[in-house]
Amino acid sequence: MKIIRILAAVFIAAGLVSSAGAQPNRQTYRDAMGRNQGTATTDNYGKTTYRDAMGRTQGSASTDNYGKTTYRDAMGRNQGSATTDNYGKTTYRDSMGRTTGTATTDSYGKTTYRDSMGRITGTSTKDSSGRVTYRDAQGRVIGTKK
């Protein structure tokens, strides 16, 4: 359950879940073994709701007019935020405003995630079919999104 919360926050902040189109956008997250870990559904207003594999709401994310994404738990309590600068670097903050990590995407589409100390915590890559593969700092596959 923890992996879906972490991945979901990263996916939204990195702009990997889109709200374009008339139909709600639904993404399914799977672990390295291909087991369903949950979903993220974005409505036409840009609010994303995260659910676990059993369909229970785990939290949500919404973006304001200034591009700041705020994450909330299932009870609606603020869990943190993310903002992206003009260079494409996304900074994640906890509910108290302290920096918890960053994400940067290179020209090949590989996103590198770092903790607050600048250490690499993982990467993600997107293939030609749109499947995103997530790896830990050692390069092991930890999950996918399609």
Residues covered by each model-derived region:
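Bacterial N-terminal signal peptides that target proteins for export
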Residues: 1-8
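Sec/Tat signal peptide C-region and signal peptidase I cleavage site
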Residues: 5, 18-22
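Bacterial N-terminal signal peptides
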Residues: 8-15
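Short, low-complexity, intrinsically disordered N-terminal segments
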Residues: 15-18, 38
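Intrinsically disordered, low-complexity proline/glycine-rich segments
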Residues: 23-146
